[in-house]
Amino acid sequence: MIIDMEKVQELIEAPLSREELAVRYRDLCEDPLFANVPGKIEIDPWGRMVMSPPGVYHGLVQARLARVLASLGGETMVETPIATPMGLFAPDVTWASGQFMSTHGRENPLMAAPEVCAEVVSPSNSVKELKEKTEAYLASGAHEVWIVYPQSKRCEFHGTQGPLERSAYAVDLAGLFR
């Protein structure tokens, strides 16, 4: 067998496109070595896997937030992969309208962000990382990005025009941090 070395890519020379990230993610999903990996997998712009297993309280807040968002109708999803211009990320919780789901519901990963993307902050998160994810979700079509801080029991809301005083989505977050 002769290998055409012109076609062999040994190094990644530039950040991957959304489409290339999507292919990389689907390949990982189909790889038996990753079938039972606990926690979510994200892929940075260079195609590297990033794994961030959550703690118990993080999971509780995530589940409560999913229940709250379910009151809006539509679909609530957890750790759903989204291919963005800045990497493939899996927000802790997302909410999508029926219209969004009819257009994008069968994609794996999603090639656009649902209307609401929420990140539940973990001690390992950095301000820079959260800012980048917020920008990535908004650039991919999210209407709002919620940053949920379990330790300080607060939420930040971001829209396409910047920080929001409150969310445009009428949900009761009072029981989120009990």
What are the functions of these language-model segments?
Residues 1-178:
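Gly/Pro/Ser/Thr-rich low-complexity, intrinsically disordered segments predominantly at protein N-termini
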